[in-house]
Structures are given as C-alpha cells and as structure tokens.
C-alpha cells in the first residue's frame, strides 16, 4: 500500500484503488472524521455503514469513535461525522446506518485485557451515563437517530435486523438480544429508493412479490481471518440495491473488513471505504480481490 500525506496535514492516509472488471474500490486508511473532509461534495448515491458501537469493542487505535468516556460524546462525534458525510451525498442520497444497543456497566469499569483478540471487548467500561441506572438498556440507536434528525437528516424508517443465529448471552433476568437496528435517513425530502430491487416473496400465492417489510431476518456472517462478526453481505446488498443506481458510487466511512466493497463489486457500483485500522484494511483488500 502506498503512503502519502494528505492535504489536511493531520494524519497519514493510505489510499489504494482496487480495479476490477466492473468497478473500482478505493480504500482510505485513516480516521473517518478527517478523511471525509477530503472527499468531494455530492458524489455518492448512498452511504452504507456500521459505526463502532459505544464501549463494546477496542479496535486498537487511541481516540477511536466508540471509546468516548460518555454516551453524549459518542453521539456528538457521530453527528459531526455524518454532517460532513451528508455534504458528500447527492441531493437525492441516503444513509443506511446499522447500530446496536448496549447496557450500562452496573458500576464495573474494568475488564480483563485480551491481547490475543483483535476485536476484543474494551478493557475499560464507561461508567453509567447520567440519568440512567445500573443495568439499564441505554437506547443508543434511538438517541443517535433522533440526534441525526435534529441535525437535519430526514429519518425515514427504522429496520429491525433479526439475527436467527445470534450469540447466546449468559443472562437469566431478560431475553437474549437477537436484533439490531438499521436506520434509513435521507439528505432531502425526495430521495432515490429502488423499492422494486429489494421486494420480498409474498405469502399470497396470487402475488409475485411485495414491498419489503421492516424486519430483515439475516444471519450474522463470520469471515476466516477476522476476530469479529462482519457486516452480513445479504444486509449490505439490500441497502446498496435500494440506495444506489447501477454504476453509482457508495461510501462506507467505517469499512471494517470491506463487506460494502465486496457487495459493490458484485452489483457494479464504485465504492470508497475508510478504515482506521490498517490490519482490517488489509483484510478488506483481500476480500474484495477474492470477492468473498
């Protein structure tokens, strides 16, 4: 990968353009909060992404989004980032945002460190946010959704990602959580949405297909070589199909292992992915080249 200094003079970015027989995918290694500022305005059809969840995973970089001391700073960091992202969207562009929830720590602030697990849990657990009690469900997805709405985004719908193969939890005082949220937000009142491309089978045999509902049953999807469950291709495919035209351009500011890029290659879209962790960026490159 080729290193170069960017015009912000704030950090080093690695940019790599992977050409295929169909479309290109550019991977930028750096902090999304800075990298997005170097992107042109109104160039993307849609954004498909899953930010790091607050206080859950350590991706090995100081100052990373998700490692804030309190939930309000986490929400603010994401609102500020997605305000810059909105500038890069076409006027009819959309944001497809996957975000999970978490619970307050119950007063415990430290976990045992796990250096062998690259996607390890945070060794530091943020204290219980003001106004909440130990063991409370924080409501992170809706806090973020309403904050984005207040910042100018159109909040169009919530989608429940139901995970049939969810990980078990060692809890006996509540149900095991088996879902996350996907929010569809738009830059403007009118936006591109190809509903026909993601129609689902109808239960009525007289009907061919019907408008897709807001509960998506999609298994989590591990990938060999990673230490975490990657963004499922089936879910990314629905977002890319509905949110972009054939030959269009998609942004993922939290590229991770590159699922959005893999799907864009399959669907004849260009993609720009931003990833803070160089190891994950290398994994993303490998996946895109192998189309896996």
Curated annotation (Swiss-Prot):
Give the EC class as a word.
Answer: transferase
Per the UniProt entry, the Enzyme Commission number(s) are 2.1.1.113
Molecular function per GO: DNA binding; N-methyltransferase activity; site-specific DNA-methyltransferase (cytosine-N4-specific) activity
Question: Pfam families recorded for this chain?
Answer: N6_N4_Mtase
Transmembrane region(s): none
Q: Cellular component per GO? A: cytoplasm
Matching entries from InterPro entries are given as: DNA_methylase_N4/N6 (IPR002941), MeTrfase_CN4_CS (IPR017985), RM_Methyltransferase (IPR001091), SAM-dependent_MTases_sf (IPR029063)
Q: Does the keyword Methyltransferase apply?
A: yes
- Please list the reactions this protein catalyses: a 2'-deoxycytidine in DNA + S-adenosyl-L-methionine = an N(4)-methyl-2'-deoxycytidine in DNA + S-adenosyl-L-homocysteine + H(+)
Top-level taxonomic group: Bacteria
What PROSITE patterns does its record include? N4_MTASE (PS00093)
GO biological-process terms attached to the record: DNA restriction-modification system; methylation
Does this UniProt record's set of keywords contain Transferase?
yes
Entry keyword set: DNA-binding, Methyltransferase, Restriction system, S-adenosyl-L-methionine, Transferase
Spell out the residue ranges making up region: Disordered.
110-130
Family according to the record? Belongs to the N(4)/N(6)-methyltransferase family. N(4) subfamily.
- Stated name of the protein: Type II methyltransferase M.SmaI
Organism of derivation: Serratia marcescens
Gene name, please? smaIM
